[in-house]
């Protein structure tokens, strides 16, 4: 295997969107074209019992929302594609943000009837901060939606990124006729036996169809006043190519995939803590853990650490360093994924995502290196939780299952664990309410441990250096706790309590996460 050639073939990207924009459906269609599934099962299949391939966890199947990041790999057009389907629900932004650290590009799915929605904007900010390319898919043209020019304007005004339409819709909803493909200079037809037609045939095909006349006017306007196409600007994350289509009817998706693979970047390097970039073509293997998932196979109660390979080649059975602990590990049981199905990996290269079976060795953010390399990559973002619950086992006889479940789910990074400094009582912290619901559901379903949860409301959280801590600083308005790494942390009742503390202890430095 020529490693350099293999790395050049890799395209690793995440799909981001607001809930219900059609993200899971387009993921299904991409897998369909990659030959990984025989038919695309959409989220709407909830009533029929056919579930989306990428929504594999029980609670996702029940609700039709993605609450964890699935990793899927397929080959298409000479490229090895690693697609990461991220959680669409805002409560799971932590998991999504970490996933966005492991990709080289993003596909942003937008509901053409709704335009840019809140979650899309939040996720776009993370992508923009990383400076990776964004490819936009305006979805649901099979339904009536907003004017294409309005959608482009909103994209530029709200997200602050220039856009270039790669195609343009001819009608929409019941009047949808197809796409005017500006990039490939052809027509893509929605109805009839022929998939494509030349632009010259447009007048003959559509006659005096008012929608086609409107398209010609719009394109003339775009040619005069629109942005110029620039591959350089796309790769710099300054220009987003915009594709229109319908994931549900699988229209425009294949053209999107082919064009995306043409322009999406090959694997990037990754920054170490000293600021130096590790090049993907470095011969030495390196990677980082961006996600840990327990119970991907409920029959085996397993844990998988998802690793983005940054450089070199992984070979089964290789020994790696874990600089955080100063210890080593052997990577013998390693898989690659198609949502819930997986296969053992013999080798993989920079850009690939591999799953390492984990018995509690790894944590989110860990760096893996080989040989004399003991460096660490820059830390992944961590988040300050906003709402808290006290949690305990409902049945004292189930304490062992309760502790195992809490330990594993916390290590996934899906929820944060704190202990009352004095009593040792468990408290959970989350970004949003849904995280608590998923935690409770999984504790009962996967660990057979019912839990009692009592709301503590919103808290303002700040970390304090152990050397600055005096337990007498704690009061009814600022409870003292330890995080899962035994670092002291204050849970302030509100901003007023925080300001009061800061005034009383001006020399004490309080730290806030993202």
UniProtKB/Swiss-Prot annotation:
NCBIfam families: prfC, PRK00741.1, small_GTP. Gene3D superfamilies: P-loop containing nucleotide triphosphate hydrolases (3.40.50.300), Peptide chain release factor 3, domain III (3.30.70.3280), Translation factors (2.40.30.10). GO terms for biological process: regulation of translational termination. It holds the Pfam family RF3_C. GO terms for cellular component: cytosol. The keyword GTP-binding applies. PROSITE patterns: G_TR_1, G_TR_2. It comes from the Bacteria. Increases the formation of ribosomal termination complexes and stimulates activities of RF-1 and RF-2. It binds guanine nucleotides and has strong preference for UGA stop codons. It may interact directly with the ribosome. The stimulation of RF-1 and RF-2 is significantly reduced by GTP and GDP, but not by GMP. It is found in: Cytoplasm. Belongs to the TRAFAC class translation factor GTPase superfamily. Classic translation factor GTPase family. PrfC subfamily. GO terms for molecular function: GTP binding; GTPase activity; translation release factor activity, codon nonspecific; translation release factor activity, codon specific. Residues 8-268 form the tr-type G domain. This is Peptide chain release factor 3. Keywords: Cytoplasm, GTP-binding, Nucleotide-binding, Protein biosynthesis. Disulfide bonds: none annotated. HAMAP family: Rel_fac_3. Its main location: cytoplasm. InterPro entries: EF-G-like_DII, EFG_III/V, G_TR_CS, P-loop_NTPase, PrfC, RF3_C, RF3_dom_3_sf, RF3_GTP-bd. GTP binds at residues 17-24, 85-89, 139-142. The keyword NAD does not apply. The lineage of its organism: Bacteria, Bacillati, Bacillota, Bacilli, Lactobacillales.
């Amino acid at each position: 295997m020529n490693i350099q050639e293999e790395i050049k073939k890799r395209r690793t990207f995440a799909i981001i969107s607001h809930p219900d924009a059609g993200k899971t459906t387009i993921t299904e269609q991409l897998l369909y074209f990659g030959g990984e599934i025989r038919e695309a099962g959409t989220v709407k299949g909830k009533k029929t019992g056919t579930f989306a391939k990428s929504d594999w966890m029980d609670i996702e199947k029940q609700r039709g929302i993605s609450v964890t990041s699935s990793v899927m790999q397929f080959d298409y057009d000479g490229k090895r594609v690693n697609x990461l389907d991220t959680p669409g629900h805002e409560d799971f932004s932590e998991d999504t943000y970490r996933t966005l650290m492991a990709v080289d590009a993003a596909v942003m799915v937008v509901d053409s009837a709704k335009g840019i929605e809140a979650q899309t904007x939040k996720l776009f900010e993370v992508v923009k901060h990383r400076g990776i390319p964004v490819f936009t898919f305006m979805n649901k043209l099979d339904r009536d939606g907003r004017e294409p020019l309005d959608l482009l304007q909103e994209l530029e005004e709200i997200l602050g990124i220039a856009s270039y339409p790669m195609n343009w819709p001819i009608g929409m909803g019941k009047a949808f006729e197809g796409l005017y493909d500006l990039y490939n200079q052809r027509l893509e037809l929605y109805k009839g036996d022929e998939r494509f037609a030349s632009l010259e045939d447009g007048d003959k095909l559509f006659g005096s169809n008012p929608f086609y006349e409107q398209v010609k006017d719009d394109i003339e306007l775009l040619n005069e006043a629109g942005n110029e196409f620039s591959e350089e600007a796309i790769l710099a994350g300054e220009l987003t190519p915009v594709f229109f289509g319908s994931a549900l009817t699988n229209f425009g998706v294949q053209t999107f995939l082919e064009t995306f693979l043409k322009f999406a970047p090959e694997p990037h390097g990754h920054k170490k803590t000293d600021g130096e970039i590790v090049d993907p073509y470095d011969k030495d293997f390196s990677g980082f853990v961006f996600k840990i998932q327990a119970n991907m196979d409920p029959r085996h109660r397993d844990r998988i650490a998802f690793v983005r390979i940054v450089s070199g080649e992984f070979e089964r059975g290789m020994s790696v360093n874990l600089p955080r602990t100063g210890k080593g590990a052997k990577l013998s049981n390693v898989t690659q994924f198609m949502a819930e199905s997986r296969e053992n990996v013999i080798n993989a290269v920079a850009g690939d995502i591999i799953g390492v079976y984990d018995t509690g060795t790894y944590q989110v953010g860990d760096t893996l290196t080989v040989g004399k390399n003991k460096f660490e990559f820059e830390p992944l973002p961590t988040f300050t939780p906003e709402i808290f619950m006290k949690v305990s086992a409902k049945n004292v006889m189930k304490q062992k299952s309760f502790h195992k479940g809490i330990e594993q789910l916390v290590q996934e990074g899906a929820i944060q664990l704190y202990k009352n400094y004095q009593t040792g009582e468990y408290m959970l912290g989350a970004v949003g309410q849904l995280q608590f619901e998923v935690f409770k559901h999984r504790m009962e379903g996967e660990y057979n441990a019912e839990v009692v949860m009592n709301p503590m409301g919103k808290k303002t959280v700040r970390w304090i250096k152990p050397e600055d801590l005096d337990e007498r600083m704690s009061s009814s308005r600022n409870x003292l706790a330890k995080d899962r790494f035994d670092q002291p942390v204050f849970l302030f009742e509100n901003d007023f309590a925080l300001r009061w503390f800061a005034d009383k202890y001006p020399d004490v430095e309080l730290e806030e996460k993202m």
